[in-house]
Amino acid sequence: MDDKSMARGRKAFVTGFPIRHSRSPLIHGFWLKELGIDGSYEAVEVKPEDFSSFAASLAANGFAGGNVTIPHKEAAYAAAESLDEAARAIGAVNTLWLENGRLCGGNTDAYGFAANLDASAPGWDKADRALVLGAGGASRAVVHALLSRGVCHVSVVNRTLSRAEELAAHFGARVYAHSWDEAQALVSNAGLIVNTTALGMSGHGEGQDFPIDLTCAPKEAVATDIVYVPLRTAFLNKAEKAGLKTVDGLGMLLHQAVPGFERWFGQRPQVTQALREHILADMAKAGAL
């Protein structure tokens, strides 16, 4: 029996609350059509108080698995009977699947972050030092990716220093916490600068100047933002003006979807320019570029 036959009729989902904004159905729908797989992927809105019962009834509802987004990533971590290494390190689950009747959880955000940089800025992981702006939930996946790829020194800056200290304590050696006031001084020796804050994203002062001068960064430094709405954030615009190589956040969204699709439907999809243009067209239609 070939992979397409095995995947026939399989169902997967993305769940969050709210979920109407998700572009995951567009991504997976594109791959299902491209690969000729008779499966489905749907958005399912689940309230926080209903998540545990939803997770427990995946098999009964005919799902092979699915993606989990805000605010359910920690609840999915708690619900999973088995966790992959990335999920354990990050403390959150964004991908669920059933294996021999057991609910398994993984986290593909770190994979997606690194794969996006591999595709758009190959050699990025030669940087000895990285600067991560922000210490929210998303920054954990970024830090895990950096450590996994051998970055020697990761500086995390945050307006609330205790959040950065908590993150540094979680990951241990090679991760250092700093206050936001120290960010400017840290730019000068950072080979990779990652923005994980909401500064510059839609609804968070996207028209304003990013509050850090990037002109003193090493000329070979790479700057990337995990935000993809808008595609060109205030941070990326400033990095570009400073002459840095920039990588937008859309690729992270696309690449993080790959492992889950392969688990549910049995074929590994490719992140192509055609897929990117498909999502960009939807973003343009929604006025989200």
Swiss-Prot record:
The active site is at K73. The keyword NADP applies. Shikimate binds at S22, R23, S24, T69, N94, D109, Y228. Coiled coil: none annotated. It comes from the Bacteria. Keywords: Amino-acid biosynthesis, Aromatic amino acid biosynthesis, NADP, Oxidoreductase. GO terms for biological process: amino acid biosynthetic process; aromatic amino acid family biosynthetic process; chorismate biosynthetic process; shikimate metabolic process. It holds the Pfam family Shikimate_dh_N. Pathway: Metabolic intermediate biosynthesis; chorismate biosynthesis; chorismate from D-erythrose 4-phosphate and phosphoenolpyruvate: step 4/7. It catalyses: shikimate + NADP(+) = 3-dehydroshikimate + NADPH + H(+). GO terms for cellular component: cytosol. Belongs to the shikimate dehydrogenase family. Homodimer. Involved in the biosynthesis of the chorismate, which leads to the biosynthesis of aromatic amino acids. Catalyzes the reversible NADPH linked reduction of 3-dehydroshikimate (DHSA) to yield shikimate (SA). This is Shikimate dehydrogenase (NADP(+)). It comes from Brucella abortus (strain 2308).
